Amino acid sequence: MVSSRASRRKRASATDIYKTCKQSGTCPPDVVNKVEGTTLADRFLQWASLGIFLGGLGIGTGTGTGGRTGYIPLGGRPSTVVDVTPARPPVVIEPVGPTEPSIVQLVEESSVVSSGTPIPTFTGTSGFEITSSATTTPAVLDITPASGSVQISTTSYTNPAFADPSLIEVPQTGEVSGNIFVTTPTSGTHGYEEIPMQVFASHGTGTEPISSTPVPGVSRVAGPRLYSRAYHQVRVNNFDFVTRPSSFVTFDNPAFEPGDTSLTFEPADTAPDPDFLDIVRLHRPALTSRRGTVRFSRLGKKATMFTRRGTQIGAQVHYYHDISNITATEDIEMQPLLTSESTDGLYDIYADADIDNAMLHTTSHTGSTGPRSHLSFPSIPSTVSTKYSNTTIPFTTSWDIPVTTGPDIVLPTASPNLPFVPPTSIDTTVAIAIQGSNYYLLPLLYYFLKKRKRIPYFFTDGFVAV
């Protein structure tokens, strides 16, 4: 079985390959030599042509063309085409002599000038004839009115040059005082018109949208970023920058200068202030607060360079002047209205001024555990006119002194013998017996498991802290 061979694809011509690969420099050497004529055969012919003449023979490495005249077939001659030149009329060239004028007249001379159509002439007496006739019949017009109704029309015109005094309208009295209110009589019948009133805004909750598509939230206008890297910061210490900013850029007359608008200047070589050199525009001012000061700011644009197209190139500068400092809030110390004295170790006790049978005595008892004391309160004279008075007495928190209730609490039965409280240390738990109808235990003896609270000590009417 004969296997089929793949068909060989024809390569592009050397000229096509040379056009595409010459620019990139990837042409094969044989293609370059063939197109440029630098093959070995071409070089041999060049060397041989130095000694012999081979011109016109068409000998070369290229396609054979037979030279300039082509190949001549055997047994015949090549067909030739004879070009016949069309005949042209001869042009007579007239020589110009030295005495003849050199001005060429484009229009030939003519002695006859056409004057147009001649005007016709009329001869004789013929023409329009005018005849006159005379009649003796007078022209009589019939002025007898025709039968029927008679219509009379009258038309009057007013002459502005003359006006009858009876037709002049008397001018009304005008108000020359400062009162702008015109009063009208209230008596009688007055005409009026009822106009229905329309409600423009109904009462609602106040949250209804005022547009068809309300924008959620509040949109705020972003302030100028004056302290970014795009602006060069320049501080101006002169206060004239606030009132007369143009005096720093140009030498002009400050008779009129708007201070709240943008200012435009022409480029100048010099400026009163070197910091304002090449400034062509100062924007409108802005008041800001920066680090505890009220600051007056203006943005300026410089035109340092100009391109050939007229484009201005320059930096943007932030000029600012601190007007005043924002002082911090002063801390005013509050003064007390009443002077207070030190009451270390003193407590206030409300006592009844009407009780006279109470006595202050201290009794010492000696036992097996130690001595003990008993403290009672006598009747204290009142310093005010009310029933109860406030008297300050010294008081110490000793463990061996039991305290009874105040004299203002009347008990139904009172025991003459007070219970004995043995002195113990603070670290150990003791049992406390207090005679009274109402009392609070010492907060130090409470056992708090999780959270502790600060409980104040009270020693007032009916409340005793031990």
UniProtKB/Swiss-Prot annotation:
Any one GO BP annotation for this protein: symbiont entry into host cell
Motif window: Nuclear localization signal: 1-12, 447-455
Post-translational modification: Highly phosphorylated.
Disulfide bonds: 21-27
GO molecular function annotations of the record: DNA binding; structural molecule activity
Subcellular location(s) of the protein: Virion; Host nucleus; Host early endosome; Host Golgi apparatus
Superkingdom assignment: Viruses
Keywords: Capsid protein, Cytoplasmic inwards viral transport, Disulfide bond, DNA-binding, Host endosome, Host Golgi apparatus, Host nucleus, Host-virus interaction, Late protein, Microtubular inwards viral transport, Phosphoprotein, Viral penetration into host nucleus, Virion, Virus entry into host cell
GO CC term (a single one): viral capsid
Subunit text: Interacts with major capsid protein L1. Interacts with E2; this interaction inhibits E2 transcriptional activity but not the DNA replication function E2. Interacts with host GADD45GIP1. Interacts with host HSPA8; this interaction is required for L2 nuclear translocation. Interacts with host importins KPNB2 and KPNB3. Forms a complex with importin alpha2-beta1 heterodimers via interaction with the importin alpha2 adapter. Interacts with host DYNLT1; this interaction is essential for virus intracellular transport during entry.
Role summary: Minor protein of the capsid that localizes along the inner surface of the virion, within the central cavities beneath the L1 pentamers. Plays a role in capsid stabilization through interaction with the major capsid protein L1. Once the virion enters the host cell, L2 escorts the genomic DNA into the nucleus by promoting escape from the endosomal compartments and traffic through the host Golgi network.
Family stated for the protein in its record: Belongs to the papillomaviridae L2 protein family.
Protein name per UniProt: Minor capsid protein L2
Source species taxonomy: Viruses, Monodnaviria, Shotokuvirae, Cossaviricota, Papovaviricetes
